[in-house]
Amino acid sequence: MKLRPLHDRVVIRRSEEETKTAGGIVLPGSAAEKPNRGEIVAVGTGRVLDNGEVRALAVKVGDKVVFGPYSGSNTVKVDGEDLLVMSENEILAVVEG
């Protein structure tokens, strides 16, 4: 199945969790925080402005992004994988380099 987000929404695949601390302690899944980074796998057509124009999104498929800890509360399971659906304005930054 393939998701096509609407308007200014994006679909993000979370980065893999770091399950080991810098000191080598392995964290159980319940103790590890969910990562706030991911890769964009799909983007919507853009934000519809008040005058009816559609403004394209500033992010694109493949971008690595950082988002807030409470962003992306909409989780969708696609082909056994949990993906996040959020508005572009919930993305804090694009990771470059």
UniProtKB/Swiss-Prot annotation:
SUPFAM superfamilies xref list: GroES-like
Biological-process GO terms, alphabetical: chaperone cofactor-dependent protein refolding
Subcellular location: Cytoplasm
PROSITE patterns: CHAPERONINS_CPN10
Key words, A-Z: Chaperone, Cytoplasm
Molecular-function GO terms, alphabetical: ATP binding; metal ion binding; protein folding chaperone; protein-folding chaperone binding; unfolded protein binding
GO cellular component, one term: cytoplasm
Matches recorded under Gene3D superfamilies: GroES chaperonin
HAMAP family, per database record: CH10
Quaternary state and interactors: Heptamer of 7 subunits arranged in a ring. Interacts with the chaperonin GroEL.
PANTHER family: 10 KDA HEAT SHOCK PROTEIN (PTHR10772), CO-CHAPERONIN GROES (PTHR10772:SF58)
NCBIfam families with a match to the protein in the record: PRK00364.1-1 (NF001526), PRK00364.1-2 (NF001527), PRK00364.2-2 (NF001531), PRK00364.2-4 (NF001533)
UniProt record similarity statement: Belongs to the GroES chaperonin family.
Function description: Together with the chaperonin GroEL, plays an essential role in assisting protein folding. The GroEL-GroES system forms a nano-cage that allows encapsulation of the non-native substrate proteins and provides a physical environment optimized to promote and accelerate protein folding. GroES binds to the apical surface of the GroEL ring, thereby capping the opening of the GroEL channel.
UniProt-recorded name of the protein: Co-chaperonin GroES
